[in-house]
Amino acid sequence: DEELKLLLESLDRREERRCGERDSANRWRSERGYRRLPDFKKCAFTDHLKPMIILSLHTGMRRGEVFDLKWQHVDFTVRSIAVVGETAKSGKTRHIPMNRTCLEVLGRWQKQCAKSSGRVFQNADGMRFNNVKKSWTAILEQAGIVNFRWHDMRHHFASRLAMAGVDLNAIRELLGHSDYEMTLRYAHLAPEHKRKAVELLD
């Protein structure tokens, strides 16, 4: 998918740029005898944005669910994320398996964060994010992507599952749709899956 490729490339460029800016700032501080800031090159990520976006792309979680996610709901042993009912739109807890990409990114992010049972993503004040509109808009502009909302990453996740032949009911459960009709919008993306189903009658 071209948009996904552009988005990830833009995220990588942002990481490189922020590393360069931090190096420049630390040279300035060293020359004047000020305390150096943490070296971004020794960190897995320069901030929350890249792991937050990758998590969204690989789990289909809603933005609010990502903001509310706590480490206690991330099980690295069974490779699963619990979206608890109080934070889920449907009011029901669902479990989303983590693929290798998601597992690696969250593992690296956890090592970088202070050990706590708090939120996976916290703002500079240690509080819940309300939005990431400024950084999200900037990353899209740098990628040359237009008319793409944060919620579209959720659609992208579901579309890839449908095209891979995943059962629509499984997609519904992963997305946390309370209404099956909402999941049916992805049915047209799985023609091969439907063809194989009909061939079972031969």
State where each predicted segment sits.
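C-terminal catalytic core of Y-nucleophile DNA break-rejoin enzymes
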Residues: 1, 88-108, 117-138, 149
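Basic, Lys/Arg- and aromatic-enriched nucleic-acid-binding interface segment
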Residues: 1-63, 67, 77, 88-92, ...
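DNA/chromatin major-groove-contacting recognition/catalytic segments
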Residues: 7-10, 94-97, 104, 108, ...
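Short basic/aromatic active-site micro-motif
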Residues: 46-51, 127, 146-164
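Short alpha-helical segment immediately N-terminal to, or the first helix within
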Residues: 55-56, 69, 160-161, 174, ...
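Short, polar N-cap/turn motifs at the start of nucleic acid-interacting alpha helices
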Residues: 73-80, 146-147, 166-185, 196
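Catalytic-site neighborhood detector that most strongly recognizes the C-terminal catalytic loop/helix
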Residues: 83-91, 103, 175, 179-200
